[in-house]
Amino acid sequence: MFFSLKNSVAKLIAFWAICLVLPVWAGHYTFDPILLANNNINANANTDLSLFEQGGQLPGTYQVDIFLGDEKMDSTNVTFHAVKSPTGEYSLQSCLTKEQLSRYGVDVDNYPELLPPEKNIQQDKQASQCVNLAAIPQASEEFEFYAMRLVLNIPQVALRPKDEIPVERWDDGITAFLLNYMANSSTTTYRQTGEQQSSHYVQLYPGFNIGAWRIRNATSWNQSGNSAGKWQSSYIYATRGLYRLKSRVTLGQSYTPGDFFDSVPFSGVMLGDDDNMLPSSQRDFIPVVRGIARSQARVEVRQNGYLLYSTVVSPGPFELTDILPSHSNGDLHVTVLESNGTTQQFTVPYSVPAIRLRKGRLRYNLMAGRYRPANVDVETTPIAQATVAYGLPWNLTAFVGGQWSPHYQATTAGMGVMLGDYGALSSSITQATSEYRQQQPVKGQVWEVRYNKTLQASDTSFSVVNSQYSTADFSNLSDVLQSYRRHDYSRRDWHSNSLRNQTHVVVGQPLGQFGYLNLNWSRQNYRDAPASSSWGVQYSFNIGNLYCSLDWTQNQYRGNQDRLLSLSVSMPLGRERDTYAAYRMTSSDNSKDHEMSLYGHAFDNRLSWNVRQTERYAQFHSGENSGSLGLDWQGSYGDIGGNYYYTPTIRQFSANVSGGAVIHRHGLTLGPQINGTAALVEVPGVSGVSTSEDHRLKTDFRGYSIVPNIFPYEEHDILLETTDLPPDAEVTKTDAKVLPTEGAIVRASFSPQIGARALMTITRNNGETIPFGAMASLVNQPANAAIVDEGGKAYLTGLPETGQLLVQWGRGASQQCRVDYQLANAKKGDAGLYMLSGVCH
């Protein structure tokens, strides 16, 4: 008994000694294998602990997480070589390529010694050549074997600026066909006559990705009442990024940018810089569309005559933030079609910020092609445009531009200045010669001033644009070309309602705990027509659990005035916050509505529902009741919803469906609308797994799902929800970093180990225990490995029903063996863990 106790203590001391020295790489340690022996002193005399004596491990390829300091940069397979130090000690050293270091942010161009001189010349060999990290002064690496972490310690002077992501890390994604779709249909029944009227709308956004190329199309179909359905294609184009130039080339049907001239639809070719490739701190932003609906209404948004967006909104304030961009900064013309047939019309300006560039930065755009009108009767006239802006010293920016067609020529020039604490200001003058159809050429001139500022102390943002038309004869390119129609031979005054001046003002003010205030105002004064203007005030705040918002809008359009005031109050019912009660009052010039509603969500926010009841007091009618019931299901494969709306005179049923699809080399994957850039999550063979981006989006029966709407040229962490994994699946890596280019479908790939979990006791065919520290793995699957403990036990995952394990405890052929197993012959515990034993031959 004394010998047994002494033997156990010795084994315990040896085990903890080994554990304590494993993280230490520099020292040399010697362990006596006899300490691990059982009663038979010579049984483990051949135990090979040389792997641990110097804190080392077997060289080879391991899947590791790569860190640059404390920041995770990558998860990939890295080959490690055994290297000997001048003192004779062995350690593992990674084999990283020059391209990898550049992707991780190292300024490799400043360190040519990373590769031997002959390898710097032979570019085709750089992809596989290991760099010499010692070429960077004070750079080092640490390989934490049991955590599978490779930590790179690089001095800050050897790194690129923090917000400058190397082009080498940008991912063009996979070759794929993608489709976004949106459809809604409504049927209105008039109670007095029984007459029914239906309207249907379908919007399709097909596309194809191959390499850096993106092919995109927008096609819509609209049918209302007894009229025939009509298809309309807004655009079809192919585009790709020129990453080194921070530019983009576009072929086909698109829109010119609206920073110097009004945006123009064209068919042709365009080359210009791409702001999206710049760091996020240098990018511009665009506004959203806000308004107030008096009743359940259809909102249509048009740009340059094209229908961009159509949706049904509930009574009260609405905010549209999911309009697919048309690559244009022109004004958005919004029409609100109320259920009773009345309409609202107003314009949402895109207030382009003051033009200001940092010193040395170049912004340019070149386009040549034909004018692409929305009306097929308008001629497709040849057009061209060129604009250039350059950042000068002293915070100045100079810019020039020109437009040309047979009937129109314009030039613009201006200066911008950054005023430091006082914001940014730019001013320009544009001169144009316009020749309307069947009229003599006329010359016009416009001055424009733009100013924007954010007060850092109060976080107040201002944006002001003012245009003064010096003469009555100034026109833009689209207005002139719209007069050239093929089947209209009448002589008319195309140049009516000429602008005298126009102003757009937007002010945003966060108020901390007191809410948020947003003000917007625009006005257009004409020489021979009534002025048009739009006011808007939105104020929202919280009082405990009570949410309140106040919205006021006044629109004056061609002599018609419309004013709307809305007050909304809502609060949760219960602690779960899945059901809310709300009250809304909407007042216009001729009516006042009081609405009570209940709304909420269920099934992990997948199901949204609402019930509304409204009492209307109009000028000639009082006590008119209306109500609605709506349901919407947001699933992994798209959204589907329905709505019922009634008044004393009509009943209306509507339904909508939307979603997206990606066809890739592994098949078809359905999901929500993509609207730009997306990640394809791959967990092969594991269904029902979500990510941290959206818990409602789960992998399909093959293990694939779509994470939509991620920002291009920015790094994203796609985190797998391991709680969704079934008992027979495990993943060693639960996150994937993606850095997509614009429009890319990038892979967020995970490698699940699907199969059983087992604790296996392994002995050799001569009766000896497998040496402590041996590696046991499935044959031909070295990544799925486990370490054998001092009792010959190994915890294994991802095991098939039958298989063979390879056990290694050294480099020689005599230091490995194989063991067969069958799960059917093993005992399975309550936790799903199999208890196995096997003899290694």
From Swiss-Prot:
Disulfide linkage: 817-840
First and last residue of the signal peptide: 1-26
A Pfam family hit: PapC_C
GO cellular component, one term: cell outer membrane
GO process annotations (BP): pilus assembly
GO molecular function: fimbrial usher porin activity
Family membership: Belongs to the fimbrial export usher family.
Stored PANTHER family: F1 CAPSULE-ANCHORING PROTEIN (PTHR30451:SF9), OUTER MEMBRANE USHER PROTEIN (PTHR30451)
Entry function: Involved in the export and assembly of the MyfA fimbrial subunit.
Name under which the protein is recorded: Outer membrane usher protein MyfC
Species assigned in the record: Yersinia enterocolitica
Gene: myfC
